[in-house]
Amino acid sequence: MGSRNASLPRICIALGLGDVQKLLAHARQELLAGETFLEFRLDYLPSPLDGVRAIAELLASHPECTILATCRRHQNHGRFNGSIEEQLRILDAAVDAGAHAIDVEIESAENAKTRMAELRQNTTVIISYHNYDGTPAMEPVLRRLAKIPADGYKLVTTARKPSDNEKVLALSKSGSKTPLILLAMGEIGFSTRVLSVAQGCLYTYASPHAAEGTAAGQIGARHLRNLYRFDKFTKAAKVFGVVADPVRHSISPAVHNRAFQARRLDAVYLPFLVAPQQLKDFFALANALPVQGFSVTIPHKQKILRYLDHVDPLARRIGAVNTVWKKAGKWRGTNTDAQAVVKPLSKHLRLPKSKVLVVGNGGAARSAAFALVDAGAQVSIVGRNPDRARALAKVCDGTPLLREHITRDTRFDALVHCTPLGMWPRVDETFFTDLVPADIVFDMVYNPLETLLVQRAKDLKRQI
């Protein structure tokens, strides 16, 4: 049945709902949106056979639909409490109802090899491996799967560190004669969901538009197609991204991928969730993909310097980098935050001898403080960590302040906010709870576009 794999669409919408009518409603909604490959998680239903009847009903009205039937047992992180024999009987019924393919976990397949061979005579069989704890060595897992003939092998792990993505995607180069589906669950493993098909995998999974997916890290097919241009870039595409923790708030993927599309570039820009202690590990992934360059934001702008081969003089002086790229095999870093602060402020304020309050003591605050001092401003620095704010003020020739010393009578020409306070999803947080001590407010937080600080500044008729 392996020849049928060629006709499988490249995005499978995972439908796991506990009500058969909701299952059908979401299935029809996806079909109206142009998706044609749906996974019916029969094990989510109180009666999986209701799902089998739903398959027949849907295919009667939508014969163009391709359905993958899954009925994962409870012992293997599914919801079906029956025996392996009952599980395979349900999947056999799904095939009779018109399902084009079935997914059987390796634990069941190993205990029913004869039945698996029989099922494969009538349908496309995917044998799957899931690891919810981490990402083990992948080659032994593939060898285990390969002992049972199938039309596709699915290997799904959980990414605990960035390089786990590389371990998973590297298997696409294994030379397997049987097509593979390779994914790493969780936000850290997001890149596998976008890149795996371009690397030669059979398909990837996406969540339905108006319901939760069936695995951590799934996103909607519309995001895959429209935001990440999933079906537009090739195996040779250049990979870029943003490195941060958190990273879900970032609008950088939307900005850069639209720019790539406008310029018809074979490239993709991804969000990389990298914890502070995982920066070194990220470079293992970056070198393997390979990543061509990336934006750097909270909390890595300072620590990343130690992993770069070359840093330009301004960024070295500031002690923070926000842009990294590879040239001649070497990682190079620069800082564009400095001019991003000075240029817009200069349009509204004569910076020499102006009084500017920089709020923060991290990489973005360092960039702003150094640039403003260089422009001739009198810079004061206040932060959540008074010791770090004091240290920053010392190295950039600024003046340290304590938050409690800033009152309603304190007034600056401009305030530059450089902390993550107010950033999605913690939108109710703000550094100043009851005042805006400046005539002009520059908030580096861009998601949401209007933070609590900006709202208060507008209420007080401050310039934004």
Per-region residue spans from a language model:
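Active-site-adjacent beta->alpha loops and helix N-cap segments on the catalytic face
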Residues: 45-60, 106-120, 135-138, 160-172
